[in-house]
């Protein structure tokens, strides 16, 4: 008993210390609830795709596609991480990185170019200032960007940056080049090779929708030009500072959170392109940031840059290209489907594709603005078009300073980075003249027709500086300020300004350029619109002939808007410049000094700036999509010099001054991207769709005799416009279509101008819901000349639209219209019978 009694007091505390007090049931539940909800969410996310596959009746191939997409995402993320580590190692210790071995394209600019200086003193200064730069950037995000995003939309009212850390790695200048030749004596031009590899963390959150996203690393590389002008005799000796990129910089972003979806193949290039386009709107030539250093400097004059000249590129032909298409696993050599990518600064042009030809003839013309010719080159790359990845056929790079000296070059150039191949170019440097003395001669040289206002080569350049507007009306609502934007058009070319929100006194300070075919017959049309209510706030029409009689062919004033308020005005500065080719007399044995610039890095490294920017979709809509330097269509072209024969040994042959009647065709497009060729998928699915339609037709027949047009008919108007140099197709309506489901059909019309079945050549109408007799009344056009269109066939297909992953998609009928008719210029309207495969071409005579 005593022992028991002795154990009691000793054991009691021991049990009390070893056993915790019982917890309340509510507290245990509150601790496990988040984990339970997370487990349920993960289980739901895993089971939902399985349920969706069964519910929609999809095949197992969708599972394989998802796994392949996941593997691709992980591989892409791993490659991004390796590139980031390599760039960080190069920034931390250049000498050690070079010893260990680094690719030539990753080396700094001062290694390749002797006139580029290494500026370590500048990098040390930036490194010392970097913590304070980071503080400024954090304040910019939290005090400027965050309130602006919150006020932009009611759904973003809870938007906030949870973390803004730019990282410890400072911005680095890999090389500095100062220009001393071909520059104005009152300016200093510097090119900075900048590189930023930041292990930054920028996280954002929208609490209202439990949405988190962010960025964990950013890489940006590019050439930034700094211009100090004008130099003055008083302190601080420089009037203003202008900063811009010569071309779009290279950009790579690693996303976190919800924005990880942007790393999915197909979306990663699109997201980077959108961000690059935003940067281009502010910082890529001709856009620039101008900082005045003294009050006396006319900042508006610095923001109204006049191009140094216009480069007219005759992209004529190539010879002896490599055959990249092979058969039987390379045993049989084939030909190539060559096309060219031409680049001048930030302007990118793409030629048409010549099928199966090693000596293609393009005969196309491009016109490009040149703002800063010191440091700018004409870059050309040739590729063989393939369904998967286009093969490289050669490149060429020509310094624009040499072209300016020569004024006219008509030569065969040997392609670089390939064993064989030559390219025939004719380059013209057009000077901008501020008077109309040579206008008649220029119009005669380009054969400008009096009845032809806007087609053909350009005779002049219109430069417009949109400053501001005052006293704009309120639009539809009296008590609300409008969201004004300005639409400007000359002929068929139109451009838009940025939107200024909630103001009747907008300030734009934007530059625009238009190539003009005949300034005596064309007008500048300007309209101010309210983006919020889609209504007009005022308009203005200025005949370009008015500029011909103005002082220095320039007008700088406030214009009274019509159909607007009594005091509504728009301030603009407009200048017209005549494009004049100054031909120089040369002796017969004259040898020009133009040299082809050889690449200093490998083909993969040098092509990165071009190929990285060729992923933008040209079909993106919205403001600022109209190019400021469009390729001009050529209908009546001047006769050009006979094409010289390619040289046997020298890359630069002698000029043949013989004459012939050969002419150049129009360039089909001015785009910023090389489009894929989706016709492969269309060709694969076509037999399946035709087979399904035939089976559906047999079910409809079911022992009965169908009429003459069992699939129905479609009404089209087809004509060719010689003034616009386009084929016009109007889709009016369809009748007596077959029902694709119990609710009828959801038809739309798709068209190709064969043999072109690329995405850029496709035209589609809107979808008419639940009807067998849809009415479209939509007009479409194809840029093609009359002789060319008479050798083509119009492929028209009526299809049934369905929802995403729907089984109700399919073909309702096709028709092939052979356009070999002499009545095409007049046009016709006709009903066409739909067939299951369109194998009965319908010829109009």
From Swiss-Prot:
- Composition skew (Polar residues), residue ranges: 612-628
Indicate which residues the UniProt annotation says bind Ca(2+) 3. Answer: 386, 388, 390
Q: Which residues lie on this side of the membrane: Lumenal?
A: 49-51
In Gene Ontology terms, what is one molecular function of this protein?
A: calcium ion binding
**Disordered, as annotated region:** 1-26, 584-664
What keywords would UniProt list here? Calcium, Cell membrane, Endocytosis, Endoplasmic reticulum, Lipid transport, Lipid-binding, Membrane, Metal-binding, Phosphoprotein, Repeat, Transmembrane, Transmembrane helix, Transport
What residues does the C2 domain cover? Answer: 293-413, 442-563, 710-832
Q: Which family does it belong to?
A: Belongs to the extended synaptotagmin family.
Q: At what positions is Phosphoserine found?
A: 615, 617, 660, 662-663, 667, 679, 682, 685
- What name does this protein carry? Extended synaptotagmin-2
Q: Which GO terms describe its biological process?
A: endocytosis; endoplasmic reticulum-plasma membrane tethering; lipid transport
Q: Region entry Required for phosphatidylinositol 4,5-bisphosphate-dependent location at the cell membrane: which residue ranges?
A: 757-764
- Gene Ontology CC: one annotated term: endoplasmic reticulum membrane
Subunit field text: Homodimer. Interacts with ESYT1 and ESYT3. Interacts with FGFR1 that has been activated by FGF1 binding. Interacts with the AP-2 complex; identified in a complex with the AP-2 complex and FGFR1.
Nucleotidyltransferase recorded as keyword: no
Q: From the Swiss-Prot or TrEMBL record, state where the protein is found.
A: Cell membrane; Endoplasmic reticulum membrane
The source's domain of life comes to: Eukaryota
User: Lineage, please?
Assistant: Eukaryota, Metazoa, Chordata, Craniata, Vertebrata
């Amino acid at each position: 008993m005593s022992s028991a009694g002795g154990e009691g007091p000793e054991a009691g505390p021991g049990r009390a210390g070893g056993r915790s007090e019982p917890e309340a049931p509510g507290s245990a539940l509150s601790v496990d609830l988040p984990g339970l909800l997370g487990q349920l969410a993960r289980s739901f996310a895993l089971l939902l795709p399985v349920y969706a596959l069964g519910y929609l009746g999809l095949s197992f191939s969708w599972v394989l596609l998802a796994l392949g997409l996941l593997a691709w995402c992980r591989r892409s993320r791993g490659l991004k991480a390796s590139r980031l580590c390599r760039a960080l190692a190069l920034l931390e210790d250049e000498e050690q990185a070079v010893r260990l071995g680094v690719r030539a394209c990753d080396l700094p600019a001062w290694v390749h170019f002797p006139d580029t200086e290494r500026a370590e003193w500048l990098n040390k200064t930036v490194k010392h200032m970097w913590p304070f730069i980071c503080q400024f950037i954090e304040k910019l995000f939290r005090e400027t960007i965050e309130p602006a995003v919150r006020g932009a939309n009611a759904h973003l009212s809870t938007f906030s940056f949870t973390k803004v850390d730019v990282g410890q790695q400072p911005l680095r200048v890999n090389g500095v080049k100062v220009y001393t030749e071909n520059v104005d004596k009152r300016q200093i031009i510097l090119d900075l090779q900048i590189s930023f590899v930041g292990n930054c963390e920028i996280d954002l959150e929208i609490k209202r929708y439990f949405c988190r996203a962010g960025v964990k690393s950013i890489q940006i590389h590019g050439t930034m030009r700094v211009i100090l002008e004008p130099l003055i005799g008083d302190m601080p000796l420089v009037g203003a500072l202008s900063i811009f990129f010569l071309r779009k910089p290279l950009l790579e972003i690693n996303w976190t959170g919800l924005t990880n979806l942007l790393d999915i193949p197909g979306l990663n290039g699109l997201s980077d392109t959108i961000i690059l386009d935003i940067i281009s709107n502010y910082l890529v030539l001709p856009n620039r940031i101008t900082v005045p250093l003294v009050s006396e400097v006319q900042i508006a004059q610095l923001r109204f840059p006049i191009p140094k000249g216009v480069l007219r590129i005759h992209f004529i032909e190539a010879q002896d290209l490599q055959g990249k298409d092979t058969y039987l696993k390379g045993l049989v050599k084939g030909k190539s489907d060559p096309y060219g990518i031409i680049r001048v600064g930030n302007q990118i042009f793409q030629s048409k594709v010549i099928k199966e030809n090693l000596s293609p003839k393009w005969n196309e013309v491009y016109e490009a603005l040149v703002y800063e010719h010191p440091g700018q080159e004409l870059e050309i790359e040739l590729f063989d078009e393939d369904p998967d990845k286009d093969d490289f056929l050669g490149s060429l790079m020509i310094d624009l300073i040499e072209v300016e000296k020569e004024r006219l070059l008509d030569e065969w150039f040997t392609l670089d980075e390939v064993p064989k191949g030559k390219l025939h170019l004719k380059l013209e440097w057009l000077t901008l003249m501020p008077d109309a003395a040579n206008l008649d001669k220029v119009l005669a040289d380009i054969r400008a027709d009096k009845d032809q206002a806007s087609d053909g080569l350009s005779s002049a350049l219109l430069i417009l500086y949109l400053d501001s507007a005052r006293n704009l009306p309120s639009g539809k609502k009296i008590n609300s300020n409008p969201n004004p934007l300005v639409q400007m058009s000359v002929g068929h070319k139109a451009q838009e300004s940025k939107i200024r929100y909630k103001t009747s006194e907008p300030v734009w300070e934007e530059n625009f350029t238009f190539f003009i075919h005949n300034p005596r017959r064309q007008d500048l049309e300007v309209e101010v619109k309210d983006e919020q209510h889609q209504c007009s706030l005022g308009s203005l029409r200025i005949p370009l002939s008015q500029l011909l009689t103005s002082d220095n062919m320039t007008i700088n004033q406030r214009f009274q808007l019509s159909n607007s308020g009594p005091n509504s005005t728009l301030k603009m500065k407009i200048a017209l410049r005549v494009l004049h080719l100054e031909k120089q007399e040369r002796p017969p044995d004259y040898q020009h000094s133009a040299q082809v610039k050889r690449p200093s890095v490998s083909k993969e490294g040098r092509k990165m700036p071009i190929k990285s920017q060729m992923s933008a979709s040209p079909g993106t809509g919205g403001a600022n999509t109209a190019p400021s330097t469009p390729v001009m269509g050529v209908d009546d072209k001047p006769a050009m010099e006979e094409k010289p024969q390619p040289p046997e040994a020298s890359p630069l042959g002698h000029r043949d001054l013989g004459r012939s009647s050969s002419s150049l065709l129009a360039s089909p497009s001015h785009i910023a991207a090389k489009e894929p060729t989706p016709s492969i998928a269309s060709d694969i699915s076509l037999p399946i769709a035709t087979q399904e339609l035939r089976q559906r037709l047999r079910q409809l027949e079911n022992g009965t005799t169908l009429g003459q047009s069992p699939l129905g008919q479609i009404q089209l108007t087809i004509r060719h416009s010689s003034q616009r140099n386009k084929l016009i197709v109007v889709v009016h309506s369809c009748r007596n279509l077959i029902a694709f489901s119990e609710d009828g059909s959801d038809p739309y019309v798709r068209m190709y101008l064969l043999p072109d079945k690329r995405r850029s050549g496709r035209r589609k109408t809107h979808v008419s819901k639940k009807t067998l007799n849809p009415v479209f009344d939509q007009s479409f056009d194809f840029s093609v000349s009359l002789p060319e269109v008479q050798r083509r066939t119009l492929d028209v297909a009526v299809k049934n639209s369905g929802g995403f992953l729907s089984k109700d998609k399919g073909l309702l009928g096709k028709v092939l219209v052979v356009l070999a008719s002499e009545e095409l210029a007049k046009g016709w309207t006709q009903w066409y019978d739909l067939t299951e495969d369109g194998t009965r071409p319908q010829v109009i005579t």
